[in-house]
Amino acid sequence: MIIIKSKREIDIMREAAKVTGEILRDIEGFIKPGMTTHAIDNFVEERILHYKMKPTFKGYGGFPAAACVSVNDEVVHGIPSRDRVLKEGDIVSVDTGSTYKGYCSDAARTYAVGEISDEARKLIDVTKQSFFEGVKYAMVGYRLHDIGHAVQEYAESNGFGVIREYLGHGIGRDLHEDPQVPNYGDAHTGPHLKEGMVLAIEPMITQGSYGTRVLGNDWTVV
């Protein structure tokens, strides 16, 4: 069931999202070669707590950290580790959220570690723009799959693929609510978008096949 949010609820969620966004901006100047993915997670958690909010991800479904930190071919849900050391040329995705007054936020960003290849830079740039292409359709008057259609069309027109198995979603008191928001699909299909719906739009773009598998830790997707 899609839960429509009131203006008061959306205002609370906006505060949570502002904190998450600020943390993701701050990470850009923090990440460097030689750093562990655990250090990134520690930075994220300390910042969330500084704002008197709760790390949305920590403990969710048993996830052990405040942030998913996924490196290179890891698509999502990377578990931070003291043993995983970033090196020059890596790209790293940090996915996190802050909970405020019982309402969740959820956002991700991908970063370059030092100097990266032109191909890796293009992947980051196309993924970012595909998000904004989808957001153009997150408005009353459009339908849900217009969002995914725009993401897919932009990514594929630039020579990249779109992950099928992992999706965006509604968000509110629960991190994952209805509806699921795929990053692909046919335009003019799916539920009509209504005022008060809150969506996490999460393009996952790949240089290779869109097929995925889960590693032995039961979390990390490659």
For the regions a language model picked out, list residue spans one by one.
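Active-site neighborhoods and metal-handling regions in enzymes and metal-associated proteins
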Residues: M1-V222
